Design a protein with these regions (language model features):
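Structural signature of the GPCR N-terminal helical module
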Residues: 11-73, 95-105, 229-240
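Extracellular-loop-to-transmembrane junctions of the mid-late helices
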Residues: 15, 139-146, 165-195
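Alpha-helical transmembrane segments of multi-pass membrane proteins
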Residues: 16-20, 46-60, 86, 129-141, ...
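Intracellular signaling interfaces of 7-transmembrane GPCRs
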Residues: 33-43, 108-125, 197-224, 283-303
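Membrane-interface helix-loop-helix junctions at boundaries between adjacent transmembrane segments
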Residues: 78-88, 100-130
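Fourth transmembrane helix
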Residues: 91-95, 121-154, 191
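Seventh transmembrane helix
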Residues: 94-95, 233-239, 247-256, 261-303
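Class A (rhodopsin-like) GPCR signature focused on the TM5-ICL3 interface and adjacent 7TM helical core
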Residues: 97-98, 148, 182-213
Length: 303
């Protein structure tokens, strides 16, 4: 086993354990209200879906990484896990987009008609938007999977007659195909960037105004600073995820290509990073995790 492959395997296993822990806490912290009959908000619904999606996505990605250790089974495993990886990756990015949109509509206070309309749409039709996002993720992943499998089959047939064909370039698609396959990533990225930029601008403006106010108001400034930091972390994470995803859906994964390896590692660590950001942003989830780490008890998940 090569040092690079061993490193990828260790990163994948550590990331899986960490992602499972963090996202399980997200599910426990937000899911109790769904089963207790209490009223839930839009952000909690998205958090719950993010927790489940991240765990499933991390599992299939780790399975794909482990398959590199068994070359004789890699092709079969690759065909099994490729479609789930595509679907979970797309849906996870849509969930982040709608989460950022909810943060924007909850935090900012604009009176423009367009903003009010968007806020009403998200408030009233969020479950429908999530369902539509899931269907779109499955549909585009199916098209993507078909093209990848067709390319792999053609490559294997040509390679059987001409071994020099096995070293073909890594690119899968033409530019129009890339635009179609990545359309959901592009829309999600636009929603995320727009929402976070508007939210951060609003928070920074509010913090600036609070700094010039009385000392009693300044005591609450840390809450807004923490919120702004969370938005910036989500923006950085979404940018890294977007670049890695676009590269991953358009270029064949190759252990000899450093860019390909880095992008795949970023995708593999996404569930862990997103779970960590969401937990540090929620005092309830953060205290719940710290309590469990200190004495091994899960408390506060029903509060």
């Amino acid at each position: 086993m090569s040092p690079l492959l061993l490193t990828l395997l260790v990163i994948s296993l550590v990331g899986t354990l960490t992602a499972f822990l963090l996202n399980t806490f997200i599910i426990l912290g937000t899911g109790r209200s769904f089963f207790s009959g209490a009223k839930t908000n839009r952000v909690n619904l998205i958090h719950l879906l993010i927790g489940f999606t991240n765990i499933l996505m991390q599992c299939v990605m780790t399975t794909d990484n482990i398959s590199f250790c068994f070359p004789e089974f890699y092709d079969s495993i690759y065909r099994i896990v490729t479609f789930p990886i595509m679907s979970f990756t797309r849906f996870s990015y849509w969930l982040m987009a709608w989460l950022c949109a909810c943060y924007c509509t909850n935090i900012t206070r604009f009176n423009h008609r367009i903003f009010i309309f968007i806020k009403k749409v998200i408030s009233n039709f969020l479950p429908h938007l999530l369902l539509l996002s899931g269907i779109a993720s499955l549909g585009l992943s199916l098209v993507h999977f078909y093209h990848v499998m067709s390319y792999s089959w053609k490559d294997s047939v040509e390679g059987a007659f001409n071994t020099s064909e096995m070293s073909q370039p890594d690119k899968f698609f033409t530019f129009p195909q890339i635009l179609f396959i990545s359309v959901d990533f592009n829309f999600s990225f636009i929603i995320i960037v727009t929402s976070l930029v508007v939210t951060v601008s609003s928070l920074l403006t509010h913090i600036w105004n609070m700094n010039k106010a009385d000392s009693d108001i300044k005591q609450n400034i840390q809450v807004h600073v923490n919120a702004a930091r969370t938005m910036m972390l989500l923006l950085l994470l979404s940018l890294a995820f977007y670049i890695s995803s676009i590269f991953n859906v358009t270029v064949r994964y190759n252990l000899e290509n450093l860019t390909s390896v880095v992008c795949w590692v970023l995708l593999t660590m996404f569930p862990t990073a997103e779970g960590a950001i969401l937990i540090q942003a929620s005092p309830k989830l953060r205290n719940m995790l710290l309590t469990w780490l200190s004495d091994g008890r899960l408390v506060g998940c029903g509060k």
